[in-house]
Amino acid sequence: MASTPTNLQKAIDLASKAAQEDKAGNYEEALQLYQHAVQYFLHVVKYEAQGDKAKQSIRAKCTEYLDRAEKLKEYLKKREKKPQKPVKEGQPAPADEKGNDSDGEGESDDPEKKKLQNQLQGAIVIERPNVKWSDVAGLEGAKEALKEAVILPIKFPHLFTGKRTPWRGILLFGPPGTGKSYLAKAVATEANNSTFFSISSSDLVSKWLGESEKLVKNLFQLARENKPSIIFIDEIDSLCGSRSENESEAARRIKTEFLVQMQGVGVDNDGILVLGATNIPWVLDSAIRRRFEKRIYIPLPEAHARAAMFKLHLGTTQNSLTEADFRDLGKKTEGYSGADISIIVRDALMQPVRKVQSATHFKKVRGPSRADPNNIVDDLLTPCSPGDPGAIEMTWMDVPGDKLLEPVVCMSDMLRSLSSTKPTVNEHDLLKLKKFTEDFGQEG
């Protein structure tokens, strides 16, 4: 092949001719010219272009020409089946190509868009999680901000007119296990008139070049079509970390598309809330951080919230704990997250089962029948110490299935589980989160 300027010039000439043929309506000729131009451009990128900026610029042009070539290819395929007026470059598509079919179904003619949107349909939460605001212990500041952004605009739309607009982006950040995703579940439950999209990086990252940013674009299009909508992105740092020279082209393009869709020129995001959650907010790109107008710190729970969590996690399970016991547990678990407390309670709930497994003696007691809880029987068996009056030497294997009465959960079970469960959050991470809150956030 000839020298660099000739190859690049040839690619530019071919692209220019393709655009002319496209405008003139010679679509078959234009398609071939676009394809040849892209081949030359890719050759220049691979073997000849110097510098990242030049390569990036050429790749962007290639994507543009390939998109147009795909549209022409689709149109030419359809034209073989039925003649119809083509879409000229730079002109809007006719009504039936935008999805307003004459048959009234409103289906999009673009198969690629349909495929991407079908891929994202799985992110829509159809069945509402049953988590109410009252199930979330503490975090009053975060709950109020979410009600202000989600519930009030739906219930009282007249409040949010003119310059008073609801928040479009809220970032929840804090140590792991403090209830960020749980709060999002509460939002999904309470905002029952909204479409809730729960997104992770695997929903948006594709191995195919250019498909990831199309998925991001289609996610926001789908949210606009189904508004009011909430887009919840868990672990957003995996998608929108700081831009650097070492990151891949694909990662940079995903970030750019997020920036454009969240707050770009000509983008209408009325009725759409983007809710992000992260444990490491300091790695977020500064432009992404700015688009989250409210940045709320979800801290480790305080003593009264921890006491309430012990109660919530015990639920209706029979136990002998008093209010004083719950307060005591709240004081003893300084530095524990909500997830840590959940693990302590789950382990404590297993203690009666372990007592049954290790028991060598059982005794007969009165209690509700397994078949009919309203009927009190006196032949149930419960574990006891060998010196207990009425103790019968036997193991749990000898106890009939419907005759076992397990011990209730008591304070000693809780303390035993607490002694074997350590907190998962370290002091170093907490200091970094507090520093980020001082610089950019607000307390939840």
Curated annotation (Swiss-Prot):
The MIT domain serves as an adapter for ESCRT-III proteins. It forms an asymmetric three-helix bundle that binds amphipathic MIM (MIT interacting motif) helices along the groove between MIT helices 2 and 3 present in a subset of ESCRT-III proteins thus establishing the canonical MIM-MIT interaction. In an extended conformation along the groove between helices 1 and 3, also binds to a type-2 MIT interacting motif (MIM2). It comes from the Eukaryota. It is an enzyme of class 3 (hydrolase). GO terms for molecular function: ATP binding; ATP hydrolysis activity; protein homodimerization activity; protein-containing complex binding. Proposed to be monomeric or homodimeric in nucleotide-free form and to oligomerize upon binding to ATP to form two stacked hexameric or heptameric rings with a central pore through which ESCRT-III substrates are translocated in an ATP-dependent manner. Interacts with CHMP1A, CHMP1B, CHMP2A, CHMP2B, CHMP3, CHMP4A, CHMP4B, CHMP4C and CHMP6. Interacts with VPS4B; the interaction suggests a heteromeric assembly with VPS4B. Interacts with SPAST. Interacts with IST1. Interacts with VTA1. It catalyses: ATP + H2O = ADP + phosphate + H(+). The keyword Protein transport applies. Belongs to the AAA ATPase family. This is Vacuolar protein sorting-associated protein 4B. It comes from Bos taurus (Bovine). Keywords: ATP-binding, Cell cycle, Cell division, Coiled coil, Endosome, Hydrolase, Membrane, Nucleotide-binding, Phosphoprotein, Protein transport, Transport. It is found in: Late endosome membrane. Involved in late steps of the endosomal multivesicular bodies (MVB) pathway. Recognizes membrane-associated ESCRT-III assemblies and catalyzes their disassembly, possibly in combination with membrane fission. Redistributes the ESCRT-III components to the cytoplasm for further rounds of MVB sorting. MVBs contain intraluminal vesicles (ILVs) that are generated by invagination and scission from the limiting membrane of the endosome and mostly are delivered to lysosomes enabling degradation of membrane proteins, such as stimulated growth factor receptors, lysosomal enzymes and lipids. (Microbial infection) In conjunction with the ESCRT machinery also appears to function in topologically equivalent membrane fission events, such as the terminal stages of cytokinesis and enveloped virus budding (lentiviruses). Its EC number is 3.6.4.6. Residues 19-82 form a coiled coil. The modification Phosphoserine is found at S102, S108. One of its GO terms (biological process) is viral budding from plasma membrane. Residues 4-82 form the MIT domain. It is a peripheral membrane protein. SMART domains: AAA (SM00382), MIT (SM00745). One of its GO terms (cellular component) is late endosome membrane. InterPro entries: AAA+_ATPase (IPR003593), AAA_lid_3 (IPR041569), ATPase_AAA_core (IPR003959), ATPase_AAA_CS (IPR003960), MIT_dom (IPR007330), MIT_dom_sf (IPR036181), MT-severing_AAA_ATPase (IPR050304), P-loop_NTPase (IPR027417). ATP binds at G174, P175, P176, G177, T178, G179, K180, S181. Its main location: membrane.
